[in-house]
């Protein structure tokens, strides 16, 4: 022991200066015999270096303290004061426990404390070390700059004044530049005020319709007379020749006021019919003879202002079937009309309409072309209408002579025949439905099958109820036989 104390009192080697703790300690060999040998231990951070002597030339063992759990006092069965301590390994590491023996109790406590600190450093080694990859390192901004020999002189007072004046000058310049950067306000207003008397932009505005003077309105009224209004005038022409001359002068002004006040969507049904089928309507002979030269040009400009002719209406089968009843009644009324109301044949030719379904439809106010050729052929544009009307200079004989140029009797007869066939077929269907509705429904296979299915369902329901009762009460052989007979009975009754 004295030798050990002498060794400890001797000077520490040069390697011990960098170590956390160094000294001579007895270390167990770990064998069965448990031999103890003096070793020079050197604690560096998280490593324990074991040497044979203080020269630190031959390292016998290197212990990584991170693989151990803790260092504590070793208690033996014998109560001798050996001052021993042990390094306990952490679970999961394939290292063995190491036993040491210190020369004194104080030395033992100091080594236990130092080794525990080394173990903690080994455990936290991953957190303490900061590894910086050189490839990912960012270059410093000013580290590689060339440094001058002297430091920069502080700015003088004159320099500060110059900087302040330049800054104030720049701010004033910015203030002056603000209006220029904003939207131009004064220059465009002056330009507009100078250009106002010329008024060139007004040409781009949509043209405002000026109120027409008395002369222009008279000219336009003399030029405009729609075909629909012309179709209305023959009704008043049948009253007499003298009142027509007085009413013809009054009707244009009234019609103009009515047309201007009412939009196109609120026109009467007769006007719509006249627009869709303008060709069969012609002016009356007495009216054409009595109209003055000033009233004749009223038709052309008014027609130009009217909306364009709608596309031809092709009646569907449902529409024709709905109108068939009206056409049949209209044809019977129109056949009786020429015998009673029109004794003269001139009225039929003047109106340009024969005993067709259109006369009945127009009298009842139902829009729709009656002749088949008018329904199938597209409506002629209003620009071609003046060519179809007879000239005003033609006489009554010319009108009567040219009237048979439009052969419509065969087509009208065919149309009537088709309508009669449709009406007859509909009436037959109605009668057949009434007869079938009054008779009892015949026995069919579906009703028999449904009855059989219902009987089978009732049988299965009764069988299920009997099964439930049989589970509660003990079934006798007689009940089982009855149930079988009942099932067979239901099966036989089912088709």
Curated annotation (Swiss-Prot):
The keyword Phosphoprotein applies. Gene3D superfamilies: Pleckstrin-homology domain (PH domain)/Phosphotyrosine-binding domain (PTB). Residues 198-213 have a biased composition (Pro residues). One of its GO terms (biological process) is macrophage apoptotic process. Residues 324-335 have a biased composition (Low complexity). Residues 235-244, 336-350 have a biased composition (Polar residues). Residues 444-469 form a coiled coil. Residues 171-411 are annotated as: Disordered. The modification Phosphoserine is found at residues 165, 168, 236, 238-239, 274, 292, 395. InterPro entries: PH-like_dom_sf (IPR011993), PH_domain (IPR001849), PKHO1/2 (IPR043448). The modification Phosphothreonine is found at residues 233, 296. This is Pleckstrin homology domain-containing family O member 2.
């Amino acid at each position: 022991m004295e030798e050990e104390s002498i060794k400890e009192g001797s000077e520490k080697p040069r390697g011990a200066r960098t170590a956390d703790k160094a000294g001579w300690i007895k270390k167990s060999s770990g064998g069965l015999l448990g031999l103890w040998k003096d070793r020079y231990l050197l604690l560096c951070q998280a490593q324990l270096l074991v040497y044979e002597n203080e020269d630190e030339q031959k390292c016998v063992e290197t212990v990584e303290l991170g693989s151990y759990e803790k260092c504590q006092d070793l208690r033996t069965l014998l109560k001798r004061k050996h001052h021993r301590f042990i390094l306990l390994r952490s679970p999961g590491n394939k290292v063995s426990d190491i036993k040491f023996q210190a020369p004194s109790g104080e030395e033992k406590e100091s080594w236990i404390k130092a080794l525990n600190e080394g173990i903690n450093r080994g455990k936290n080694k991953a957190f303490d070390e900061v590894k910086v990859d050189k490839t990912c390192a960012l270059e410093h901004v000013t580290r590689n700059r060339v440094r001058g020999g002297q430091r920069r002189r502080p700015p003088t007072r004159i320099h500060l004044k110059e900087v302040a004046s330049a800054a104030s000058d720049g701010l004033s310049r910015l203030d002056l530049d603000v209006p220029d950067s904003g939207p131009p306000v004064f220059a465009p207003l002056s330009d507009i005020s100078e250009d106002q008397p010329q008024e060139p932009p007004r040409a781009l505005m949509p043209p405002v319709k000026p109120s027409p003077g008395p002369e222009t309105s008279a000219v336009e009224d003399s030029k405009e007379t729609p075909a629909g209004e012309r179709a209305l005038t023959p009704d008043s022409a049948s009253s007499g020749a003298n009142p027509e001359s007085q009413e013809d002068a009054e009707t244009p002004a009234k019609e103009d006021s009515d047309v201007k006040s009412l939009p196109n969507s609120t026109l009467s049904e007769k006007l719509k019919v006249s627009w869709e089928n303008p060709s069969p309507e012609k002016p009356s002979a007495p009216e054409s003879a009595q109209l003055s030269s000033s009233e004749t040009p009223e038709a052309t400009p008014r027609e130009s202002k009217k909306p364009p002719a709608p596309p031809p209406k092709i009646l569907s089968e449902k529409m024709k079937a709905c109108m068939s009843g009206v056409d049949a009644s209209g044809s019977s009324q129109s056949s009786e009309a020429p015998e009673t109301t029109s004794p003269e044949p001139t009225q039929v030719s003047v109106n340009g309409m024969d005993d067709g379904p259109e006369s009945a439809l127009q009298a009842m106010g139902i829009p729709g072309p009656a002749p088949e050729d008018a329904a199938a052929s597209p409506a002629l544009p209003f620009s071609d209408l003046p060519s179809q009307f007879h000239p005003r200079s033609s006489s009554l004989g010319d009108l009567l002579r040219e009237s048979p140029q439009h052969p419509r009797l065969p087509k009208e007869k065919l149309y009537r025949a088709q309508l009669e066939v449709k009406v007859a077929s509909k009436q037959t269907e109605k009668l057949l439905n009434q007869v079938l509705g009054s008779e009892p429904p015949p026995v069919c296979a579906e009703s028999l099958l449904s009855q059989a299915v219902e009987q089978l369902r009732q049988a299965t329901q009764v069988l299920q109820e009997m099964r439930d009762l049989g589970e509660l009460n003990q079934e006798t052989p007689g009940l089982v036989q009855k149930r079988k007979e009942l099932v067979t009975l239901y099966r036989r009754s089912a088709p």
